[in-house]
Amino acid sequence: MLFRSELKLPRYGLTGQIRHAAVSIPANLAEGAGRRWQKEFAHFLSNSQGSASELETELIIANRLGYLDETTFARLISQLERIGRLITGLSRHVGRESSIANAR
């Protein structure tokens, strides 16, 4: 999604930040899913959501600096919003599961 050559980003700086945030989203999901406790998973889901917010900000900056055309920007933001909704839904589910486990 973000590593295609169609994006005309500077070689360093913003590009590295965008890549880091983009990779952090699934990396935090995977690390959290591998944890033993729901509370730990919830923590990594929160980190993943934070990385998504960071990525959104960086994409806005890239767009305003003219590195992303409006069509590409809109597509990426739309995909990122969907990812955010999925993470939010998973966070709610994990929170409910954690509450049920604590009630036992």
Label every PLM stretch briefly:
Residues 1-104:
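Amphipathic alpha-helical assembly/interaction segments
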